[in-house]
Amino acid sequence: MIEHFDVAVLGLGPGGEVAADRLLKAGKNVVVFERELIGGECAYWACIPSKTVLRPPEARTEIERAAGVSGAELDWAATAKYRDYMIRNLNDQAQVDGYTKEGAVVIKDEARVTGPGRIQAGDREITAEHIIIATGSNAVIPSLEGLDQITAWTNRETYTTSTLPERAVIIGGSAVGVETATFLARFGVSVTLIHRGERLLDREDARVGELAHQYLQEAGIDIRLSTSAARARREGADSIIDLQTRNGDPVGEVGADVVIFATGRTPRTEGLGFEHAGVTLGDHGKVQIDDHCRAGENVWAIGDVTGIMPFTHVAKYQGRIAADAILGRPHPATYDGIPRVVFTDPEIAGAGLTEEQATKQGIRTIATELDLADAIARPWTYEQDPRGHLGLLADADRKILIGAWAVGPMAGEWIHHASLAIRTQLPIDTLLDQVAQVPTYHEAYQVALEQLDLTP
């Protein structure tokens, strides 16, 4: 028997959940499909467990750097126990029950599109007026000779492990790689971080990469730049990676108990039949969407599967965009100023354009960088030997902020000041009229804005 619904949501990660919740509250008849766990990658294997295990080392650092406090010790067993609580011990029954109570039909199976408005999941055939594709992404492990001989992890094994390795090699120096390096090193693991680029976090401003490199080295992490894995092999209990330069020249080897691949993600679209609903797939299987998250007639796509800023908060935002379009109150998605945070120690945050991106767009820019300890009191009241930098990027002609980055304690919390300014295109004169609480990290914006020379 064919079952019919107003909306079918394929994938219940953060984006799918937001869309489903919004539609259910509006009285729509909704069916949701989830092949693994409701909450998706973020809730069980990425954002939530990673930030949970990063917090104890961060707290220890705060205690070590604060005057008059000592004695903080890390307890991995207790940390792992709380992490397991946070990821619900990989059990989503409460979420299944919750959606059922809200009136949704929950199907725990992989859904495949078989035609316009038609979906097959196991032996169930579904039709729907609207389909929302929210199938997420998969971790990428590059093809590597000898890969099957070594102990290879992705974020999933890393953030659900009950036992920490003594030595780890991490391949990839973007956000996941440097966060993972921070977590493991702070818990006493000997970490080697391999990155094929010339600097860490190479999608951020160059200065951000420099500061990240400095702080990771201070944490005892062995960083190998302009280096990649040539092949893998096992020697006894050791997983060995033979290294090469960007030109392919051999440059030694490194051994560890585990090799962690932080080498990106790819949209989960293969074999799911989206083309049968008129969906166009781009590079690496990205679902092509317009500014209302429309992927085809009565088909919508949100989150990692679109390849647009693959962050949880963006997926949730797109979930609102798609649901509102279905409900007849459309408004276009815009991505200016959306924050991005790397939860290292100290934190790294950014919003808007980098200087390189702005230059490529032909924008005449003015930039400034502030050493927080030289400019405001809060870093000194927060910790001894204070850390922290803030960079601002302005459009010299429009006299608005178009980019910002911050490296320092809780940077992910106070980057939102810049994020809102960039997103709303607030004039810098208006920002200068802001009165910041003293002493707070927000005060740094006032000092940095004063440094921007916007005279013609």
Language-model region placement:
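FAD-site-proximal beta/loop scaffold in flavoenzymes
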Residues: 148-164, 254-325
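Beta1/beta-strand and adjacent pyrophosphate-binding region of the FAD-binding site
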Residues: 1-13, 164-174
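A Rossmann-like FAD-binding core segment of flavoenzymes
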Residues: 105-108, 112-120, 188-291, 353, ...
